[in-house]
Every structure is written in C-alpha cells, then in structure tokens.
Amino acid sequence: GLPYAFASHFAPRMLHQALAIYRQMFKPSAALAKPYAIVGGPVIAAETDEQADYLASSTHQRVLGILTGNRTRLLPPVENFWQQLDARSQAAIADFLAAGVIGGPDTVQLGLQKLADETQADEFMIVSDVYDADLRLRSLEITADAMKA
C-alpha cells in the first residue's frame, strides 16, 4: 500500500517487470488506495539533438566505466565520442540507457511521452548527468518544459 520507485537508470531491462509485479501485488492501505509508480531514469536535454548527443558523451563515458570496472567521476563531454566506440561498447551503453531520453526539446517530449505511455508512470524522477552545472540545470529546465507540454 505504498508508492514504488524504480531506478531504471540502473536496471532498465527490469523496469516493466518490476512495475507489473508492484501493480499485481499492490494492496490498498490507509496511505494509498491505488498503486503509484515512480520511474527514475536518465534524461539529457539540450537546445538541439546534436548538442544533447555531445553532452551525453559524459554519461556514455560514465556508463562505459561502470561496465568495464573503471569508475571515475563524471568526465567532460568529448566530441564524436559515440563514433569512436566499437559496436559492442555502443550496444552495451545503449542497453544500459534503454529507458533514457537524449535530445532537444521535441525529442525529449516525445521520448518521455513514450516512456509514460509504456509504463503508465505517475511520476518521473530524472537524473541528468551533464558535466557543466549550468548546462545540467538547463537540461532539467528543458525536461520540465517538455513534461508540461
């Protein structure tokens, strides 16, 4: 009878299963009459898709470090980082970020709407791993605007 939050930025492939189990097993309580699902996930938003892809290279580096056991602090973005990766690394990063959204305002709006439709989430909890603090704040502002549209 409590809300449930799932961190899809850690285990995106388990998202739908986890939500289904939560909803199936939910029992109303004094705190909550019906299920309330929160989906946590990565969003990198910028003024354009291209700028978002560039900023996302910091996230891609972080994920690659997690997957290879080379964890570091968040690193600055790298031009054409994705193109420098082999197909296996690209696939692994894409799988890790499967529930994520990267793009300009329209792409983010469409991506979040798709995620909302697929999960029937009541709320999103966003992580935006952007290296520059001002651009991270802007990413969150663009994301908030996309959610209002």
Question: Which positions does each model-derived feature cover?
Answer:
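C-terminal helical cap(s) of enzyme catalytic domains, especially alpha/beta-barrels
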Residues: 17-25, 133-149
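Short helix/strand-capping connector loops at secondary-structure junctions
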Residues: 119-129
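Structural preference for beta-strand elements that scaffold enzyme active sites
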Residues: 3-5, 36-38, 123-125
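Active-site oxyanion-binding pockets that recognize sulfate/phosphate
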Residues: 5, 98, 133
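Glycine-rich, proline-tolerant flexible connector loops at the mouths of alpha/beta enzymes
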Residues: 9-10, 127-135
